[in-house]
Amino acid sequence: MTPFMTEDFLLDTEFARRLYHDYAKDQPIFDYHCHLPPQQIAENYRFKNLYDIWLKGDHYKWRAMRTNGVPERLCTGDASDREKFDAWAATVPHTIGNPLYHWTHLELRRPFGITGKLLSPKTADEIWNQCNDLLAQDAFSARGIMQQMNVKMVGTTDDPIDSLEHHATIAKDSAFTVKVLPSWRPDKAFNIEQATFADYMAKLAEVSDTDIRRFSDLQTALTKRLDHFAAHGCKVSDHALDVVLFAEASESELNAILSRRLAGETLSGHEIAQFKTAVLVWLGAEYARRGWVQQYHIGALRNNNQRQFRLLGPDVGFDSINDRPLAEELSKLLSKQNEENLLPKTILYCLNPRDNEVLGTMIGNFQGEGMPGKMQFGSGWWFNDQKDGMERQMTQLAQLGLLSRFVGMLTDSRSFLSYTRHEYFRRILCQMIGRWVEAGEAPADIDLLGEMVKNICFNNARDYFAIELH
């Protein structure tokens, strides 16, 4: 019987252990996509307690707690921090088999140093006090944890109208060695069907000093904001394409669509597709000219529980996997961007694992320009961010493309404790390659495979995003 979560956790062959301990473990972290609040990094936020850093805003935990029968008051409601933590501690023993069980104990181990102890109602008091004592120390501030975890770069997620003042504050501090850069997330600028679209256009008009009436006005406003982001070091964009749409339109059609929507009219599905296509194609060309990377997160079905959406708002654990077809429309969108050789470096993520092979083969259609891995099939995302999901994504990438050119893991997280997800990924990667070697499916060449592992863990992302590190 193998003990739980030793130093060789998940490393079930000697070759996997060598790969992890000698090549993967000490690689820095290049976290190119996350949802950390830049204000907390700028202010070097000190966390009040373990709830503040660990449970606050974590919809993964809330979903598990609700499933365990925990009342909403103890998830997102007005209960005390300690009450909410105790509700989580009572839920953890029920999460065996869920990645939350592994994540929880990896996060207690690093950075808190808690090993050989499982979170449960019996241990809750001891773990609460031990972690809170550590959180009072300088090394456990927002910046302190990032430095402890050997983070070199994080890409936050930012709206085009954001001032980026916190990124500017961070950049001025030469004593802080982690590169914290904004990522451009323009969803509100192309989700024309949303009830908030006209209000958002007014905000965009104000911050860009542009009167937005025609499609060219929108392009002018967005160009000004792209320049603003570029001035703050931005090299990455991100888009939530819950459904992939494609429909071409003339400029006069786009002007009419925008004008009617700003006047409060309801658009047809075809008109919505025309507008979104035009914005994404134009943005893609802008990214290509600037040398940026674009990311498409495809296939979320959001806000399914309308009652809870009205009570609590978005992003609180009521989203799931969509099953809309995506191949043909995505192909048309990428091909349109590529017509004038203005398809930027692109990372595609799918929420439905059914679509893994679709994306794994789609990226092969648009590789080239002498750039290794220009088109990427992104790491297992959200509900696939677990052992089986990561294994499937990497196996299919290896079979359909080049695993050796993969840009690797990202946290996609709102928590400063999520950096151990990089460790989890690295262990799974080394386990997978070690099993190939054990089965005679890959050569037992530690130099060859060790270098490949180092590249996937850090070097490929560093080179792909072309961001100068401290």
UniProtKB/Swiss-Prot annotation:
Lineage: Bacteria, Pseudomonadati, Pseudomonadota, Gammaproteobacteria, Enterobacterales
Family classification: Belongs to the metallo-dependent hydrolases superfamily. Uronate isomerase family.
SUPFAM superfamilies (UniProt xref): Metallo-dependent hydrolases
HAMAP family the UniProt entry points to: UxaC
Recorded metabolic or biological pathway in which this protein acts: Carbohydrate metabolism; pentose and glucuronate interconversion
An example molecular function term from Gene Ontology annotations: glucuronate isomerase activity
Name recorded for this polypeptide: Uronate isomerase
GO biological process, one term: D-glucuronate catabolic process
Keywords of this entry: Isomerase
NCBIfam families given in the database record: PRK02925.1 (NF002794)
Species of origin: Cronobacter sakazakii (strain ATCC BAA-894)
One Pfam family named in its UniProt record: UxaC
Reaction(s) catalysed (UniProt annotation): D-glucuronate = D-fructuronate; aldehydo-D-galacturonate = keto-D-tagaturonate
EC identifiers of the protein: 5.3.1.12
